[in-house]
C-alpha cells in the first residue's frame, strides 16, 4: 500500500469550482428530521445546565421555600476559618449560614450523583468492552426505553454506544457543579439549591444509564411483573457449605464468580449471597427466563457487620458503595479474607491483579495477606470460589458470637454507665437490656436486634470494652436463624402497555396514588415500619413501587398465613400491586414511570422538555416517595431529582441531618394558584403537595402525609372522594384526629367520602359557614376552589393557549 503524504493546494486561480459537503450536511439534517419524527419536536432544555434549569427551579422555590437545618454554626472550608456563622454573621468569604447550609446539601447531592454516575460509567465501559457499542438496547416491550435520558437530553438511545455521550454530558456537568463548592464561588443559597436540583436530575440520568446497560447485556428481567421470587435473610444461608458474601452495588465482577460456579457445577456445593444492591443484581443475572435464582439476598447495609461477626462468610468480595470501611479489620479477627474488585474501594490491600491465582490463594491461606485487590474479572471469577472452598475447612467454628459462658461474663462487666445509649443513633436502651440479661432474661436484647442499625458506635464508647453488637446478636440467635423471607427480583422498567392501562386512573385519581418506598436502612424504629406502610397502602389499592434496601426489608415479614407481601400481591403497575424495580439504580424507572404517564397517556412531548413534564407530574400524577431510612448522599440525590420532577418525598426523622427541606406555606392562598392552559385564566388549587421534601417522626405520621400528598388539582370527583377517604381514615386511625384542613380540598359535594357525606356536610355548615341544601344534600356556596374536570392546571404561563 502506498504511503499517504500531506500537502496543500490553492483554488485561487480556478474558475467555476464547486465544493460540496452535501453528504455530511444532508446526513445530519436527515438524522435530525428522523429524530423529530420519532421523538417529537425538541423541547427548550436539551442537555440542561444550572442556568437553563433555573427558571423551573425558581418556580418550585416560589411555592416550596427552602428550610435549612444546619448541623453546626461553623464553616471549616478554608484556611480563613473556622468561621462562626451564628446570629446572621457572615464568614471571611462573605457566605452566611443559609448559603453554607445550602452548599452542604448541594455537596451531598453531587456526591450521590457522582457515585451513581461513576458506577454507570464503569459498568457501561465494561459491558461495551465485552458486547460492543452496537449491541441494541433491550428494556422489554416498550418504545419509551429511556425516559429520563430523553427528557433531560432529548435523545433516545438505541445501542449501548449511544449511552456514551449521555455519560459524557453528566460527567461534564458534575465537574461544573463541583467547581461551585470551592470557597469564593456561589454566594446565594437559592442558587446552591438550584444546582442541587440539577444534580438530582443528573443522578436519575446516571442511574438510568447503569440499569439500561446491565438489563440489556446481563440477562436481567425486562419489564417483567412476574420476575422470580428470591430468598432473603440471614437464615437462608446454609453455613455447612463454603459461603461467599458479596457487598456493594456494582455487580460487574460478581457475574464472573457466578459464571465460574455454574461452569464448574458449584451452585449446589457452595452458597453465594449478597448485601445491599449487588445482592439484588446477583439475583437478576440471567433470570429473564424466570428461573429461580440460586444467589440469595442476605440483607441491607445495617446487616453487614452482623453477617461478618456471625462467622458465616468464608470470603467477602466487595465492589463499591455502601460497604463498611472496617471490613478488612473485622475480617482479620475471624480469618475471613476480603477481595476488593473495584478501584473505588481498595482498603490498602495489595494489588494482585497480575499474579497467579494459585499464588494468591496460598498467600491468603497462610495468613501472609488478609485479602487483595483483584481487578481482572476473569481471575476474580476463579479466585473467589476456589478461595471459599479452601478457607471453609480452615475457618470451621470461628465466629465472633460469644458462647454461653462468654456471654454471662460479658454482660456481668456492664456497670450501666449509659454511654452506649448516648452514642446510639437510635437511642436504644442498651443498659437496661444488659441488666436484664445479667438476671438471665435475654428478651430485651433479642428485641434490640431488629432496631439496631449495626453501626457499632456503642462499642466504641464502652469503658468495659464489651462487644455490644455481638452480645445483641447472641441473644437473637433464634431470630436470626428464622430470618427467612421472599422478595421479588427486580422487574426493571414499567412497560408502555402498563402505562396505557393505568394512566387515566392515576391522573383522574381513581387509582389513589403511587407510593414509592425506596432508600436505605437507617430506620428510626426497626425495619418492620416499611412493611407496615407498604401493607397499609396495598390494602387501600394504591400502587406501591419499591427498590433497594427497603424492598429487601419489606420481604422479611409475613402475615398470619406465612406469606410475604410479594406473595400476596401481584407485581404489575396497577392499583393494589407491589412492584420491585430492582437495585438502587433502578430508582430511575420509578421517576421514569411518571414521565411515561405524561408522554404515553397525555401525549406530551418528552424530548428536552423538563419543565413541562415536571409541571404535568406536579399537577396531575399522584405520586409520593418515601425514603424512610435514608442515610446516604445517593439518597439525597435521588430525592432531590424527584423534587425537580414534581414528585414530593417524605423522609425519616434522621434525614433532618441533610440540612434542607422544601416546604410550602399552606395558609398563603397566593401560593396555591395556577394557570388554566386552555385560556390562561387563574385557578385556585388545594394545598397539595404541601412539600417537595420533608421529614416525619413516626411511620404513622408518614402514612398520613403520604395519603394527603397524593391529592392533585386534576382529580375528578370520584378520585378526590377516594383520596379524601384514605387521608381522613389514616389520620383518624393513626393520629386520632380529623385533619384540620380537610375542608380546603372539597370543591363539590361529590368530592366527599360517600359513607360520611352527611356528617362532613354538617361540619362544613357549622364550622366553616358553608351553605348547604339539605333536601338535595348539595353545597350551595362555600368552596373557594371551583370544580371543572376539563381544566388544565399548569404553573407555566408559556403553555397557555393565549401565550
Swiss-Prot record:
Gene Ontology MF terms: 4 iron, 4 sulfur cluster binding; anaerobic carbon-monoxide dehydrogenase activity; hydroxylamine reductase activity; iron ion binding; nickel cation binding; peroxidase activity
Sites where the protein binds [Ni-4Fe-4S] cluster: 249, 277, 322, 520, 549, 584
InterPro entries to which the protein is assigned, alphabetical: 4Fe4S_Fe-S-bd, 4Fe4S_Fe_S_CS, CdhA, HCP/CODH, Prismane-like_a/b-sand, Prismane-like_sf
GO terms under biological process: acetyl-CoA metabolic process; methanogenesis, from acetate; response to hydrogen peroxide
Residues at which [4Fe-4S] cluster 3 binds: 414, 417, 420, 462
Residues that hold [4Fe-4S] cluster 1 according to the record: 72, 76
Residues annotated as binding CO: 116
The enzyme's E.C. designation: 1.2.7.4
Residues at which [4Fe-4S] cluster 2 binds: 75, 78, 83, 93
Catalytic activity: CO + 2 oxidized [2Fe-2S]-[ferredoxin] + H2O = 2 reduced [2Fe-2S]-[ferredoxin] + CO2 + 2 H(+)
Binding-site residues, [4Fe-4S] cluster 4: 424, 452, 455, 458
Domain 4Fe-4S ferredoxin-type: residue ranges: 405-433, 443-472
CC cofactor note: Binds 7 [4Fe-4S] clusters per heterotetramer.
Cofactor(s) annotated in UniProt: [4Fe-4S] cluster; [Ni-4Fe-4S] cluster
This protein's domain notes: Cluster B is an all-cysteinyl-liganded 4Fe-4S cluster; cluster C is a mixed Ni-Fe-S cluster which is the active site of CO oxidation. Cluster D is also an all-cysteinyl-liganded 4Fe-4S cluster that bridges the two subunits of the CODH dimer. Contains two additional 4Fe-4S clusters, dubbed E and F, that probably transport electrons from ferredoxin to the B cluster.
Family: Belongs to the Ni-containing carbon monoxide dehydrogenase family.
NCBIfam families, sorted: cdhA (TIGR00314)
Summary of the function given for this chain in its UniProt record: Part of the ACDS complex that catalyzes the reversible cleavage of acetyl-CoA, allowing growth on acetate as sole source of carbon and energy. The alpha-epsilon subcomponent functions as a carbon monoxide dehydrogenase.
Protein name as annotated: Acetyl-CoA decarbonylase/synthase complex subunit alpha 2
Organism encoding this protein: Methanosarcina thermophila
Gene, per the UniProt record: cdhA2
Amino acid at each position: 500500500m502506498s504511503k499517504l503524504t500531506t500537502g496543500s493546494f490553492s483554488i485561487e486561480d480556478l474558475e467555476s469550482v464547486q465544493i460540496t459537503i452535501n453528504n455530511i450536511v444532508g446526513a445530519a439534517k436527515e438524522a435530525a428530521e428522523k429524530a423529530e419524527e420519532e421523538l417529537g419536536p425538541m423541547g427548550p432544555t436539551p442537555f440542561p445546565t444550572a442556568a437553563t434549569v433555573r427558571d423551573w427551579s425558581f418556580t418550585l422555590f416560589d411555592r416550596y421555600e427552602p428550610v435549612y437545618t444546619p448541623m453546626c454554626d461553623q464553616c471549616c472550608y478554608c484556611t480563613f476559618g473556622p468561621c462562626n456563622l451564628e446570629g446572621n454573621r457572615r464568614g471571611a468569604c462573605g457566605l452566611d449560614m443559609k448559603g453554607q447550609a445550602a452548599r452542604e446539601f448541594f455537596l451531598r447531592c453531587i456526591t450521590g450523583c457522582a457515585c451513581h454516575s461513576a458506577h454507570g460509567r464503569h459498568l457501561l465501559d465494561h459491558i461495551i468492552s465485552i458486547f460492543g457499542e452496537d449491541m441494541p438496547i433491550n428494556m422489554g416491550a416498550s418504545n419509551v426505553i429511556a425516559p429520563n435520558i430523553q427528557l433531560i437530553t432529548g435523545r433516545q438511545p438505541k445501542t449501548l454506544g449511544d449511552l456514551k455521550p449521555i455519560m459524557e454530558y453528566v460527567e461534564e456537568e458534575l465537574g461544573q457543579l463541583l467547581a461551585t463548592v470551592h470557597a469564593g464561588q456561589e454566594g446565594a443559597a437559592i442558587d446552591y439549591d438550584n444546582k442541587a436540583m440539577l444534580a438530582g436530575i443528573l443522578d436519575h440520568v446516571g442511574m438510568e444509564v447503569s440499569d439500561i446497560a446491565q438489563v440489556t447485556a446481563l440477562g436481567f428481567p425486562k419489564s417483567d411483573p412476574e420476575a422470580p421470587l428470591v430468598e432473603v435473610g440471614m437464615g437462608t444461608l446454609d453455613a455447612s457449605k463454603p459461603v461467599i458474601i458479596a457487598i456493594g452495588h456494582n455487580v460487574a465482577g460478581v457475574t464472573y464468580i457466578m459464571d465460574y460456579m455454574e461452569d464448574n457445577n458449584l451452585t449446589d456445593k457452595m452458597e453465594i449471597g449478597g448485601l445491599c444492591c449487588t445482592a439484588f443484581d446477583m439475583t437478576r443475572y440471567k433470570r429473564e427466563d424466570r428461573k429461580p435464582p440460586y444467589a440469595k439476598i442476605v440483607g441491607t447495609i445495617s446487616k453487614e457487620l452482623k453477617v461478618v461477626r456471625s462467622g458465616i462468610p468464608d470470603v467477602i468480595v466487595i465492589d463499591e458503595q455502601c460497604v463498611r470501611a472496617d471490613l478488612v479489620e473485622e475480617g482479620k479477627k475471624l480469618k475471613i479474607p476480603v477481595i476488593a474488585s473495584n478501584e473505588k474501594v481498595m482498603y490498602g490491600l495489595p494489588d494482585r491483579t497480575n499474579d497467579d491465582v494459585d499464588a494468591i490463594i496460598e498467600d491468603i491461606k497462610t495468613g501472609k495477606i488478609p485479602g487483595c485487590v483483584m481487578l481482572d474479572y476473569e481471575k476474580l471469577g476463579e479466585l473467589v470460589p476456589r478461595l471459599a472452598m479452601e478457607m471453609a475447612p480452615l475457618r470451621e467454628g470461628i465466629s465472633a458470637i460469644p458462647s454461653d459462658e462468654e456471654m454471662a461474663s460479658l454482660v456481668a462487666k456492664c456497670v450501666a454507665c449509659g454511654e452506649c445509649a448516648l452514642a446510639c443513633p437510635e437511642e436504644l436502651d442498651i443498659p437496661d437490656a444488659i441488666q436484664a440479661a445479667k438476671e438471665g432474661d435475654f428478651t430485651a436484647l433479642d428485641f434490640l436486634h431488629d432496631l439496631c442499625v449495626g453501626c457499632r458506635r456503642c462499642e466504641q464508647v464502652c469503658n468495659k470494652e464489651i462487644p455490644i453488637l455481638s452480645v445483641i446478636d447472641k441473644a437473637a440467635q433464634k431470630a436470626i436463624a428464622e430470618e427467612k423471607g421472599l422478595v421479588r427480583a427486580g422487574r426493571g422498567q414499567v412497560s408502555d402497555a402498563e402505562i396505557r392501562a393505568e394512566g387515566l386512573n392515576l391522573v383522574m385519581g381513581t387509582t389513589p396514588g403511587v407510593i414509592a418506598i425506596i432508600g436505605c436502612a437507617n430506620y428510626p424504629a426497626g425495619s418492620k415500619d416499611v412493611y407496615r406502610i407498604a401493607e397499609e397502602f396495598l390494602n387501600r389499592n394504591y400502587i406501591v413501587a419499591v427498590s433497594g434496601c427497603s424492598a429487601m426489608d419489606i420481604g422479611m415479614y409475613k402475615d398470619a398465613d406465612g406469606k410475604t407481601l410479594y406473595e400476596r400481591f401481584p407485581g404489575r403497575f396497577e392499583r393494589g400491586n407491589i412492584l420491585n424495580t430492582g437495585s438502587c439504580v433502578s430508582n430511575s424507572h420509578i421517576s421514569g414511570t411518571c414521565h411515561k404517564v405524561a408522554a404515553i397517556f397525555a401525549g406530551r412531548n418528552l424530548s428536552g422538555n423538563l419543565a413541562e413534564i415536571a409541571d404535568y407530574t406536579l399537577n396531575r400524577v399522584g405520586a409520593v416517595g418515601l425514603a424512610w431510612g435514608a442515610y446516604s448522599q445517593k439518597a439525597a440525590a435521588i430525592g432531590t431529582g424527584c423534587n425537580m420532577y414534581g414528585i414530593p418525598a417524605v423522609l425519616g426523622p434522621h434525614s433532618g441531618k441533610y440540612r434542607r427541606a422544601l416546604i410550602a406555606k399552606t395558609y398563603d392562598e397566593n401560593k396555591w394558584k395556577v394557570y388554566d392552559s386552555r385560556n390562561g385564566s387563574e385557578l385556585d388549587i388545594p394545598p397539595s403537595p404541601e412539600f417537595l421534601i420533608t421529614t416525619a417522626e413516626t411511620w404513622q405520621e408518614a402514612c398520613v402525609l403520604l395519603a394527603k400528598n397524593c391529592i392533585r388539582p386534576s382529580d375528578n370527583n370520584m378520585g378526590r372522594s377516594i383520596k379524601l377517604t384514605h387521608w381522613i381514615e389514616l389520620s383518624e386511625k393513626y393520629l386520632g384526629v380529623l385533619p384540620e384542613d380537610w375542608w380546603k380540598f372539597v370543591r363539590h359535594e361529590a368530592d366527599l367520602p360517600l359513607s360520611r357525606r352527611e356528617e362532613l356536610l354538617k361540619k362544613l355548615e357549622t364550622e366553616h359557614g358553608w351553605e348547604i341544601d339539605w333536601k338535595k344534600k348539595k353545597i350551595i356556596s362555600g368552596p373557594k376552589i371551583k370544580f371543572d374536570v376539563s381544566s388544565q392546571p399548569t404553573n407555566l404561563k408559556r403553555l397557555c393557549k393565549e401565550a
